[in-house]
Amino acid sequence: MNSNKKKGLTAASLIVLLLIIDQAIKLAVKLNMTLGESIHIFDWFQIEFVENNGMAWGMELGSKLFLSFFRIFAVVGLIWYVRGRIKKGARMAYIVVLSMICAGAAGNIFDSLIYGQIFPASTPYYIEGAVPSTLTTWGEGYAPMLMG
């Protein structure tokens, strides 16, 4: 196997692996934690259940549908860019970093595509004794496709 094919296979495998890990963690949090709850892992690391309506830090630029289409465009562009960098012989470390960014962006597309369809809306208020979210019948969640 030549070097470019090896890099391409590594990039694709890393993206798929990170997407699986990302979704497994998000589903575990959504199904086992209440909004605002946190789990202490180390002094410097905790998992906290927060929900974000927009982009990073809750920024909102236009509608959720616009954001979803922007994400799709960005992931397609990033995959095209990674492919081009592989063909030009970029270092593996650079390909790995780009693949990680691509996996994160693709995970956000999956979230907006699916989560609004399968989960009820989370309450922003702490309710004593609240139970974690449950799955709903497909299409009966809190938002239409690409707007979750």
Task: Write out the residue ranges for each language-model feature.
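Alpha-helical transmembrane bundles and membrane-interface segments of multipass inner-membrane proteins
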Residues: M1-G148
